[in-house]
């Protein structure tokens, strides 16, 4: 039996990132410990963690450098402040009861340590690695994080080294701005004018894609690096190729026409799943779209419904119950088919005064085109809709509050 812990503390070149395993000396952890100590790797030579020369810590701890140690200067950082920090963190964890003292002889710890080659401040190297090791040990012994914690955080944060946010639609509602334009200059002007809000999704409209190609998505990305960008391809055929083209240009989602055959739609949705992007099934002019959706083996992530003024009359003529009906159809029925993660977008002449009705009907995404892009005051027009939505997720969340609750 062994436990796993991880922690990142600090900033700059002295930042500490600790990965560790703690487990029984007689089990898999002990075997890994012995293997690491006896099978040396050039530039990554493991060393026992000592509080001071001739006094190794308990539980016995093996330090493995993550970054290649290429010179004596690098070795000094590992054998000096990093080794001391890890040893004292382990010993203090025993003293504080994080590691049971009675188990200290029966356990071993393997600590993978990151030391940047350009780190210079030995005090910071010590401080950050001490804190990170101790935190990683506590997390390992307490089983942090829980699966529920991981699921609740996976779409919220961003990795500092990655340099950008991979946006996921985890907290609707959202405002999708349809850039149905034929001018690159006008597109750039509108994007630069829109509020920088997480709740705004940018759609490369069909006219833009037809005139400038799917590469227009990358231009939008240059203007709004962390935006959620939709390529409105209205794919009818060869869906796999078109979806891959959109994904290659960094689109987060691609719109597929619901008028296509079941086979074509499923291939496009499957390709979107392979590429790791959202699939949007556009039900414009699709009759019996509920039946079509039910017949799909692979369900889309999002269904786009368009305002149909004749729908209510048609259902009434059939003698069907209208209680759950909206101008876009029975949104809640669509959601039941899609499952708990499915989203519904609605489009068609929506104004700020009409928006609340759409949200109350169950819509997750409000698609707006002319009201915003045709406005003399694009920013104000977008804010008219955003006023009906909650603040962006985590607006009031303090830094570091994403970690353990205490």
Curated annotation (Swiss-Prot):
Pathway: Carbohydrate biosynthesis; D-ribose 5-phosphate biosynthesis. HAMAP family: Fae_Hps. Keywords: Carbohydrate metabolism, Lyase, Multifunctional enzyme. Residues 162-406 are annotated as: 3-hexulose-6-phosphate synthase. Catalyzes the condensation of formaldehyde with tetrahydromethanopterin (H(4)MPT) to 5,10-methylenetetrahydromethanopterin. Catalyzes the reversible formation of ribulose-5-phosphate and formaldehyde from 3-hexulose-6-phosphate. GO terms for biological process: 'de novo' pyrimidine nucleobase biosynthetic process; carbohydrate biosynthetic process; L-ascorbic acid catabolic process. Substrate binds at residues 19, 48, 66, 68, 83. It comes from Methanothermobacter thermautotrophicus (strain ATCC 29096 / DSM 1053 / JCM 10044 / NBRC 100330 / Delta H). The lineage of its organism: Archaea, Methanobacteriati, Methanobacteriota, Methanomada group, Methanobacteria. It catalyses: 5,6,7,8-tetrahydromethanopterin + formaldehyde = 5,10-methylenetetrahydromethanopterin + H2O; D-ribulose 5-phosphate + formaldehyde = D-arabino-hex-3-ulose 6-phosphate. GO terms for molecular function: 3-dehydro-L-gulonate-6-phosphate decarboxylase activity; carbon-nitrogen lyase activity; hexulose-6-phosphate synthase activity; hydro-lyase activity; orotidine-5'-phosphate decarboxylase activity. This is Bifunctional enzyme Fae/Hps.
């Amino acid at each position: 039996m062994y436990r796993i812990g991880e922690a990142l503390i600090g900033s700059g070149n002295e930042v500490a990132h600790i990965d560790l395993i703690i487990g029984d000396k007689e089990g898999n952890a002990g075997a890994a410990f012995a293997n690491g100590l006896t099978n040396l790797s050039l530039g990554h030579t493991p060393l026992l963690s000592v509080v001071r020369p001739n006094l190794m810590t308990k539980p016995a701890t093996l330090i493995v450098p993550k970054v290649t140690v290429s010179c004596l200067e690098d070795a000094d950082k590992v054998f000096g402040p990093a080794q001391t920090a890890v040893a004292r963190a382990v010993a203090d964890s025993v003293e504080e009861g994080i590691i049971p003292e009675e188990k200290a002889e029966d356990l071993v710890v393997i600590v993978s340590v990151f030391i940047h080659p350009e780190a210079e401040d030995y005090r910071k190297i010590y401080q950050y690695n001490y804190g990170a090791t101790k935190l990683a040990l506590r997390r390992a012994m307490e089983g942090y994080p829980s699966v529920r914690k991981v699921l609740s955080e996976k779409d919220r944060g961003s990795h500092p080294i990655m340099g950008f946010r991979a946006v996921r639609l985890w907290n609707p509602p959202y405002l999708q701005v349809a850039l149905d334009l034929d001018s690159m200059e006008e597109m750039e002007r509108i994007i630069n004018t829109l509020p920088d809000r997480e709740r705004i999704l940018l759609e490369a409209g069909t006219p833009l894609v037809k005139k400038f190609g799917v590469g227009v998505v990358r231009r939008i990305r240059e203007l709004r690096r962390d935006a959620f960008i939709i390529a409105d391809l209205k794919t009818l055929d060869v869906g796999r190729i078109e979806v891959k083209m959109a994904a290659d240009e960094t689109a987060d989602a691609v719109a597929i026409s619901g008028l296509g055959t079941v086979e074509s739609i499923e291939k496009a949705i499957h390709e979107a799943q392979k590429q790791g992007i959202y699939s949007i099934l556009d039900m414009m002019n699709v009759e019996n779209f509920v039946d079509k959706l039910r017949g799909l083996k692979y369900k889309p992530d999002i269904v786009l419904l368009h305002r149909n003024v004749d729908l209510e009359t048609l259902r009434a003529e059939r003698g069907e119950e209208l209680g759950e009906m909206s101008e876009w159809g029975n949104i809640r029925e669509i959601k039941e088919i899609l499952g708990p993660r499915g989203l519904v977008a609605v489009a068609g002449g929506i104004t700020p005064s009409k928006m609340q009705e759409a949200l109350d009907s169950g819509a997750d995404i409000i698609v707006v085109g002319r009201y915003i892009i045709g406005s003399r005051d694009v920013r104000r027009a977008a804010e008219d809709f955003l006023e009906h939505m909650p603040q962006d997720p985590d607006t009031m969340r303090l830094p570091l509050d994403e970690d353990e609750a205490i």
